[in-house]
Amino acid sequence: MTLEEARKRVNELRDLIRYHNYRYYVLADPEISDAEYDRLLRELKELEERFPELKSPDSPTLQVGARPLEATFRPVRHPTRMYSLDNAFNLDELKAFEERIERALGRKGPFAYTVEHKVDGLSVNLYYEEGVLVYGATRGDGEVGEEVTQNLLTIPTIPRRLKGVPERLEVRGEVYMPIEAFLRLNEELEERGERIFKNPRNAAAGSLRQKDPRITAKRGLRATFYALGLGLEEVEREGVATQFALLHWLKEKGFPVEHGYARAVGAEGVEAVYQDWLKKRRALPFEADGVVVKLDELALWRELGYTARAPRFAIAYKFPAEEKETRLLDVVFQVGRTGRVTPVGILEPVFLEGSEVSRVTLHNESYIEELDIRIGDWVLVHKAGGVIPEVLRVLKERRTGEERPIRWPETCPECGHRLLKEGKVHRCPNPLCPAKRFEAIRHFASRKAMDIQGLGEKLIERLLEKGLVKDVADLYRLRKEDLVGLERMGEKSAQNLLRQIEESKKRGLERLLYALGLPGVGEVLARNLAARFGNMDRLLEASLEELLEVEEVGELTARAILETLKDPAFRDLVRRLKEAGVEMEAKEKGGEALKGLTFVITGELSRPREEVKALLRRLGAKVTDSVSRKTSYLVVGENPGSKLEKARALGVPTLTEEELYRLLEARTGKKAEELV
């Protein structure tokens, strides 16, 4: 390659990387995978090293990311710069990292390292003065980020006040979305026909950038912290001499710290930890795209310093990319228990993360339009959250012109009934649709619902084909003679299944509500409804206003639930379940001792805050996150926040934790220990 050819390619790569930085850091909507981005950056680095005259101070190899949009949130300049990390992709590159340290320090290793999971989320910086949180901000370009304080404070584990810390302190960490929360959020968005998130990192970034903190609060974000900016030297003078000790110091101060960190000696020791964690990667509750390797001794950090982009004492050792290219051969349409029609892509089979992948959900019309995906396209697939096969992007550069657009059916693929279109969602309105019946029974019997073990998909199909069941209530009318003689169903299997069905009657109201598939009702909302109303009879008579008082219920969900509760077919189903002996009382019964009262909690309590909130709701109270004139009481714990000042200004009564428990005892006749 000549110098001019290299110059042209370097300029192309810089423009391309800057564009993808903008998509990744600012819009939180990347167009390419991490592996593809790493390949571009590596190519640029190699060309700059091969042709030093092409190096430039504004090259993306010397920068962290893209500046945030000024119109979104207030720009904040970090007191000390937030650096990115250089990457290693194999043991040789890890050894090269250690060799660079040896040369810089003028002595041979091996050195001690702290190894941490590289949680795939959004980097944030918390700034404290005299132990009080002043603001929290995203990393942005490393020098200027966006203030997102109110949204960060919806994460309950982030401390607002600290004791025994430097006067000015920066604490760095990662905000992420647990895989379970990510899958649940996408399921809700898909059900509404809205745009889904491609991965947990995008979901975390999008949730943290919400203008309404109430939306952020419902997204289940978590945070983990691992570094200091300002204040590090003072903490060192207190005797914290290693990264391992610093993580322990952060935990002592009340910060959430990802527990799976380890010490290792030398590159070979790090490699052993890396390989062990790689095997266990999919057991983690969060996405991790590698490990972070840091020289353990903090004093050596100052000797080594930083490049323009990254520290010389740390490196990200990335897990191998788990993405595959394949072709979309066809699209079929499935009908769910609510009648929603979902497109499913049929792929040329590929082996991905230990299993063969031949089908992938295409979610809804919005998703297909956004991807501009067509039958015959080459696509890049991965497993979202390490679980569900998903299309990362369409490889449009490989199109031949023979690809075909995806056409939505006008009639139900299962029963032939004409489909209804609600926004971007297509539904079958036929109550007798066999696919809806199948999915309703399958969901009812699932582990998180009524947990009827042994009632698998094949058996449900046979029961429907033989006319033995038409809906979930019919399960409780099955007899041994109905089952014996079905394919692969002997007398013992029949007895076991009937025993499981009988045991499912005792699951309680919260599991039953989830099992019945009320619109918008997942596990959390089912628990909240059960705690608020206590039994099915009270819920059936609930008003719109009462439903709106339930935590997590918005107006659209409340109206949809109310419509279902008033539906004669639903009421008849409930009646038949009750006659069959299905219990319809909450396992944790609610009450009316605090009905009509609204509580807000501030500060640290002796019991976990969520436990106290659940207790108040169980007794009929409403618990909110902000103080208003409608607040009945503000419960004040240790180190209260600004809610106390607002309560005083509005004249809202306050209770200490002890006074709260005395109030509960007076209202219920029971001590707090008996109620919790």
Swiss-Prot record:
Known catalytic reactions: NAD(+) + (deoxyribonucleotide)n-3'-hydroxyl + 5'-phospho-(deoxyribonucleotide)m = (deoxyribonucleotide)n+m + AMP + beta-nicotinamide D-nucleotide
Chain residues that bind NAD(+): 34-38, 84-85, 116, 139, 174, 294, 318
Residues binding Zn(2+), per UniProt: 412, 415, 428, 433
Domain BRCT: 589-676
Entry keyword Metal-binding: yes
Record GO biological process: DNA repair; DNA replication
Entry annotation: catalytic residues: 118
Pfam families: BRCT (PF00533), DNA_ligase_aden (PF01653), DNA_ligase_OB (PF03120), HHH_2 (PF12826), HHH_5 (PF14520), Nlig-Ia (PF22745)
Signal peptide: none
GO cellular component: cytosol
Cofactor(s) the record lists: Mg(2+); Mn(2+)
Enzyme class: ligase
Disulfide bonds: none
Molecular-function annotations in GO: DNA binding; DNA ligase (NAD+) activity; metal ion binding
Similarity comment text for this entry: Belongs to the NAD-dependent DNA ligase family. LigA subfamily.
Name assigned to this protein: DNA ligase
Native source species: Thermus thermophilus (strain ATCC 27634 / DSM 579 / HB8)
Lineage start: Bacteria, Thermotogati, Deinococcota, Deinococci, Thermales
